[in-house]
Amino acid sequence: RFLPNAFSSQNHIEEIKGVYVPFWLFDANASGSGLYEATTSSSHRNGDYVITTTRHYDVRRAGTTQFMGVPVDGSTKMPNGHMDAIEPYDYRAFQPFSTAYLPGYMADKYDEDADTCQARAHSRMQNSVSSELSASITGYSSVSTLSENISIDYTAKHYALLPVWMLHTKWQGKDYLFAMNGQTGKLVGDLPVDKRKVAAWFAGISVPLMILLAFLL
């Protein structure tokens, strides 16, 4: 259904299902500092020679930031790469959990607890702080990290069920998996897709699965 017409005769959609995927959402305050080596280079010609001058600088950066609702899926059944790639969700649309939203859709219970998932959230936050510190250094030919110190203080965690559409398809004898954000329609997968087909299909099924279910902890 989602593949371009050229692929239609060579693939078979095995399954499409709507799933409420368990997620842990982490809030935290983070601070970071780093020491970086930056260089600038300039060249000029002197007779038959080209002389290049490289200058080295020690650059220090420090900053703080706040993370709200960093999501980590708590189901080993779901591929982490797909779940990360279909972000973000609009948490302003959260609704208190109610079984009234579940008929017709699968709802997984987490099999990875908050402590296990916090390790992934921690890595994501650290990488984000590190990237922001490095990105703040501009105007140099090159920048390399000498040392960084990043501290993360967790302030809250939340448990939520977030809507995902999963599509399993077979093409040329191989199985492929697509995932779609059930709120925004963002689609990730391995094969080329016809975005017009995706948009048309999503328009028909998105409304009943746009509920984000939150558990108060």
What kind of region is each of these model predictions?
Residues 1-170:
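Charged, low-complexity helical/coil segments in non-catalytic cytosolic or luminal regions
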Residues 7-11, 180, 193:
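Short coil/turn linker and secondary-structure boundary residues
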Residues 33-35, 174-175, 186, 196:
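Flexible loop/turn segments at secondary-structure boundaries
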Residues 162-191:
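Extended, hydrophilic extramembrane loops/domains of integral membrane proteins
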Residues 190-202:
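Juxtamembrane/start-of-transmembrane alpha-helix segments at the extracytoplasmic/lumenal side
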Residues 202-209:
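Bilayer-spanning, highly hydrophobic alpha-helical transmembrane segments
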Residues 211-217:
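Juxtamembrane boundary at the C-terminal end of a transmembrane helix
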